[in-house]
């Protein structure tokens, strides 16, 4: 596997496709470029998903995230591009990408984008006393 930034996302078979479970990933070193100024924008990306048949491989996810370092785009566009690419690669039951961009001009920006597979609904929440 390469150690260079890459838009290629590798996947592997879900080891327990019969069960809904949540994967939570925190990516604290995301960087892209402001399309207006060319200055770097920094963010923490949170990826939460319920896999179906495929899971994303972590090293390829890291290299995928690195591939944005020289890409200029608005926060909203980047967040939705990440979601679209990950949904295309894994076809999850549910996926949410939350991008928390660090302060720029005195403003923090958080963008949340979600995907839900048609017909899928989470199990009811269980409350234990």
UniProtKB/Swiss-Prot annotation:
Identify the taxonomic lineage of the organism of origin: Bacteria, Pseudomonadati, Pseudomonadota, Gammaproteobacteria, Chromatiales
Q: Where in the cell is it found?
A: Cytoplasm
> At the top level of its lineage, which domain of life is listed?
Bacteria
Pathway given in the UniProt record: tRNA modification; tRNA-queuosine biosynthesis
Its cellular-component GO annotations read: cytoplasm
- Tell me the PANTHER family matching this sequence: NADPH-DEPENDENT 7-CYANO-7-DEAZAGUANINE REDUCTASE
Q: Which residues form the active site?
A: 34 (thioimide intermediate), 41 (proton donor)
- The protein's name is NADPH-dependent 7-cyano-7-deazaguanine reductase
Q: Which GO terms describe its biological process?
A: queuosine biosynthetic process; tRNA modification
Which E.C. number(s) belong to this protein? 1.7.1.13
Task: Report the InterPro entries cross-referenced here.
Answer: GTP-CH-I_C/QueF, NADPH_dep_7-cyano-7-deazaG_red, QueF, QueF_type1
Give GO MF terms, alphabetically.
preQ1 synthase activity
Listed transmembrane segments: none
Q: Which species does this protein come from?
A: Alkalilimnicola ehrlichii (strain ATCC BAA-1101 / DSM 17681 / MLHE-1)
